[in-house]
Amino acid sequence: MSTSVEPNETEALLRKQNDLSTTASIEEKYPHQQGEAAEDDDDTLKRTQYDEAKETAESLKQVESILAPIVFTALSFFVRFYRISVNDHVVWDEAHFGKFGSYYLRHEFYHDVHPPLGKMLVGLSGYLAGYNGSWDFPSGEKYPDYIDYTKMRLFNATFSALCVPLAYFTGKEVGFSMFTTWLFTLMVALESSYVTLGKFILLDSMLLFFTVATVFCFSRFNNFNNKSQEFSRKWWKWILLTGVSIGCTCSVKMVGLFVTTLVGIYTVVDLWNKLSDKSISWTKYIQHWFARIVALILVPIFIFMLSFKVHFDLLYKSGTGDANMSSLFQANLAGSDVGGGPREVSMFHSVITLKNQGLSGGLLHSHVQTFPEGSKQQQVTTYGHKDSNNNWIFQRARGQPYYDTSGNTTDIEYIFDGMHVRLMHPQTGRNLHTHDIPAPVSKSEYEVACYGNLTIGDPKDNWTVEIMEQASDEDKMRLHPLTSSFRLKNEVMNCYLGVTGTTLPQWGFRQGEVVCYKNPFKKDKRTWWNIENNRNAVLPPAPEDFKLPKTKFIRDFIQLNLAMMATNNALVPDTEKQDDLASSFWQWPTLNVGIRMCGWGPENPKYYMIGSPATTWTSTVGVILFAFIVLYYLIRWQRQYVDFPSTNPHKLKLFLMGGIYPMFGWGLHFLPFAIMGRVTYVHHYVPALYFAMLVFCYEVESFSSRLNKPNASPVSKLLYLAIYIGLLSLVAGTFWYFRYLSWGMEGPKEDWKHLKLLESWRVSDDQYT
């Protein structure tokens, strides 16, 4: 069978043969050019594969940046929400902050050492839970059925859980690699003390949230703080948000001043560097100052003051904290018993109370007990509570005729500026008196006591009324309750009645010390007094149309903050009592002790607040190690080594934002508790721990990055992965092992003996039950 071929097909076959022959001849004549063409094809293929791999990596990076924070946040919410309502009793400081939340819902004024924002948020949680504020959260009591305490706890736990995504994004902004960011985020998510505190109605999670937010915002701002982006919208956005976060942190607890100082250090360094940059004009440099003054000073102050304005507006009824404010402020509270008497003060007939206008305030007080040393006469103190021993009566000065008490009520002697008087204590019949004897505590001033009676005494009983200010439009020469500020000068000793702010020892019932100041300056409010209550059966009541002047917000704001400071300074350890919950600063980073947060009987779940060994111990080692790292770099810098070349700005940024500033943050939040005199507790380490974990993760990043260089061997890359897998597993495994310290240990304490890692942990022992 023959095969026929069409002419066109024949031509095609011939052309193909010729092409093949031509190609073969070219390859034979120019073999090196053919090799180069093959190499070009290989390079093109490699570039294509590289581009595809790069696109894949970028896609995975984008997926990770979305998926990872979601996963970590979900984990954080789970460990904090799980078993959150299993203990239906008031746990630990819920007794304080739950009660403060109730005051907001009842609008009753109260006093506390902390600023109001966190407690107003507690009140908000109660409002959202449908609670009416009628319960005072007695310690250890079971929650009534009408209080949805679970919702209130969930509200607080949300602040704790939201620290985790902020930690993730902070790690990214600082410059951590993906695995280091995961490690840092997991440490925050599974830190036992964070989880435990996040389950209850407390302020610590709110404080931590706003602290973490401040660190994130200023880390984010740092990445826009360069010449190409300065004063851009994002630059302004993040510096303003940093200021808002600072204001919120300080409005929860005054500990926020520590993170404020950290941002201040960063700002000073930044402005100093800009000052030495000759490319920045003076106009632009001044603009940098202006921006920071507005965003980092004025905005936080505004937020802080705004929280107090809302605080005053919400608490418009008389409550338990009235005595810490001025008499005029108290009189303007609804339901107050202050300020209801006559508007004039008269000799003998007016039974008055005297309120000091100094920092510690208090009402002038006396009782039958005497000073153990000095004159050994009847004690005179200041007292913050209502008491009949706070009452005083004006009498004529020693040497003048006694006031006629035969029943003539028409001859009224009003108290006026410059008048010489005696002050008699009606409960004991003795006169307010001073003499050349040192005060019991403040030895440089004169002692004030009560001495004699109506007929027995001497000229040192005499005092001169000096009116300093009048807040109303009434007769400026007369003494008026609430609105007249005055001093009392002893004629013989030439000194002024005042308070020191010092607390007397136990023999003085821990009441305030009263002295006679030898040389006070005229505006010293410790020597200023006003009449708070005025009972007088002879004088008519205040006119119906009379309205007390309102106090000014600024004055109330300053006074309340001074009162908060005074109360905080008074929280010193009592050597005569044992505080089983108190601890020393060195015990926190070492996990030497924790806190039993509730009763330790078998009937209720028990919570032991302590840090996780996997996060606290590692971060403590990290802080110590970092001090040596800084010393190492300083020595090398002194020897003119360049460890942070300008060609690698990422290394310097990572060192500063991941190491130096977090180290400052740890020191600022930890060291003050080592030197302050007030009583301290484990939860005071909560913000400092966050910075310590940042320092530790920087060290992990710094070391591990050397194992993951592009030209690293497979063994190095395997070791790199092993380090992170090991650390992540350690953090997760440690939390899981100790999880019921945070989730609640049910049954007898002996069943949980295996969780007692150190002998000092009071998990299963009978001590301090």
UniProtKB/Swiss-Prot annotation:
Q: Name one Pfam family in it.
A: PMT
Q: Which UniProt keywords apply?
A: Endoplasmic reticulum, Glycoprotein, Glycosyltransferase, Membrane, Repeat, Transferase, Transmembrane, Transmembrane helix, Virulence
UniProt induction comment: Transcribed in the yeast form, but expression is increased two to threefold during hyphal induction. Also induced during cell wall regeneration. Up-regulated more than twofold when PMT1 expression is impaired. MSB2 functions not only to secure basal levels of the PMT2 transcripts but is needed also for up-regulation of both transcripts upon PMT1 inhibition.
Intracellular or extracellular location(s) = Endoplasmic reticulum membrane
EC code(s) of this entry = 2.4.1.109
- Disruption-associated phenotype: Disruption of both alleles leads to letality. Disruption of only one allele impairs filamentation and leads to an altered cell wall composition with reduced amounts of beta-1,6-glucan and shows reduced virulence in a mouse model of hematogenously disseminated candidiasis (HDC) and using reconstituted human epithelium (RHE).
**Gene Ontology cellular component list:** endoplasmic reticulum; endoplasmic reticulum membrane; membrane; plasma membrane
Q: Where is the MIR domain?
A: 342-397, 412-468, 474-534
Its membrane topology, per UniProt? Answer: Multi-pass membrane protein
> PROSITE patterns given for it?
MIR (PS50919)
Q: Which residues cross the membrane?
A: 59-79, 152-169, 176-194, 200-218, 252-272, 288-308, 615-635, 655-675, 679-699, 718-738
One Gene Ontology biological process: single-species biofilm formation on inanimate substrate
Q: Which residues are glycosylated?
A: 8, 132, 226, 324, 408, 453, 462
On subunit structure and binding partners, the annotation says: PMT1 and PMT2 form a functional heterodimer.
What is the name of this protein? Answer: Dolichyl-phosphate-mannose--protein mannosyltransferase 2
